[in-house]
């Protein structure tokens, strides 16, 4: 929808609503159903070189499976975001390169999963993370996204944000872990209390200086949820639970609800509300 169209990491998307990597995004049939049912970007499930049978959340058929689907969908003007895991730096770099050459527009390094955290340990030090990001950046032409763990280890949030900016990372994928009792006046964007980071997504948006965009993942089940995520800094939202419960139609429903709320509040574009939350205190 025109009102929900955005530019994420320099890539034009027809909606700010997308699937979260994982649900309904691993098998050919479900990927094609998502592609047909929703106009926004399509996010692949995280993959490695040879595929995995476990853990269940990373079960996948391997990078060539996803690269083949990308090569089919990209000529049909589908914007694809591919997600990468691996248990070595070399594997992560290799997978990113294969997906990039298949034509995906954004390559996400899923550095948040325990599988990567416990093997590659990218957040063990600033130097380690910077070296990995630099290697991947040198391998791909697509925009680079980093999925951040809830607690990025030894690296402070401000230092991490500065590194994302310095290394040319286009997108930070963050948890939309807003307080359950958060009170937001949708019409004005006012939030009770003093200025404070409300979620990981909000915290990294505040540190971004507009250099990278933020995708908020989690807790988005309605158009209102998406609206609040946008108010607190998210350029786009990733939908998981609603997709599992409702199937592919959940994305279109949330997109339509968001579009309706934007219209009700006199907004011509979702871009008008990104980061516009204000504190009363």
State where each predicted segment sits.
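N-terminal capping/small domains of soluble enzymes
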Residues: 1-80, 84-90
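Hydrophobic faces of well-ordered beta-strands that scaffold small-molecule active sites
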Residues: 15-21, 40-45, 80-84, 107-109, ...
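Catalytic cores of alpha/beta
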Residues: 28-34, 90-101, 152-167, 208-213, ...
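Glycine-rich phosphate-binding active-site loops on the catalytic face of alpha/beta enzymes
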Residues: 44-50, 106-115, 171-181, 219, ...
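Glycine/Thr-rich beta-alpha phosphate-binding loop at enzyme active sites
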Residues: 53-60, 114-124, 157-208, 212, ...
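Alpha-helix-loop-beta-strand connector modules within alpha/beta enzyme cores
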Residues: 60-79, 124-146, 188-215, 254-270
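Conserved alpha/beta-domain cores
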Residues: 84-140, 158, 164-175, 191-195
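Alpha/beta catalytic cores of nucleotide-metabolism and tRNA/nucleoside-modifying enzymes
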Residues: 195-212, 221-281
């Amino acid at each position: 929808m025109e009102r929900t169209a955005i530019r994420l990491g320099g890539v034009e998307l027809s909606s700010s609503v997308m699937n979260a990597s994982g649900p309904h995004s691993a098998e050919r049939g479900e990927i094609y159903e998502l592609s047909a049912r929703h106009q926004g970007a399509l996010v692949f499930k995280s993959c490695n070189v040879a595929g995995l049978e476990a853990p269940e959340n990373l079960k996948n058929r391997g990078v060539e499976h996803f690269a083949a689907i990308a090569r089919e969908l990209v000529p049909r003007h589908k914007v694809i975001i591919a997600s990468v895991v691996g248990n070595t730096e070399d594997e992560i770099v290799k997978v990113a390169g294969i997906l990039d050459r298949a034509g995906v527009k954004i390559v996400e390094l899923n550095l948040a999963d325990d599988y990567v955290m416990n093997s590659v340990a990218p957040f063990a030090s600033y130097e380690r993370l910077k070296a990995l990001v630099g290697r991947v950046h040198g391998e791909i032409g697509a925009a680079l996204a980093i999925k951040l763990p809830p607690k990025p280890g030894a690296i402070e949030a401000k230092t991490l944000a500065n590194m994302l900016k310095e290394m040319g990372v286009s997108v930070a994928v963050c948890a939309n872990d807003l307080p359950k009792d958060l009170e937001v006046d949708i019409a004005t964007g006012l939030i009770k209390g003093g200025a404070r980071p409300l979620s990981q997504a909000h915290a990294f948006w505040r540190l971004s200086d507009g250099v990278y965009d933020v995708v908020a993942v989690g807790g988005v089940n309605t158009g209102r949820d998406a609206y609040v995520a946008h108010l607190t800094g998210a350029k786009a939202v990733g939908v998981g639970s609603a997709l599992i419960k409702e199937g592919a139609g959940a994305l279109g429903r949330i997109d339509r609800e968001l579009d309706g709320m934007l219209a009700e509040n006199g907004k011509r574009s979702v871009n008008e509300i990104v980061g516009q939350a204000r504190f009363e205190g």
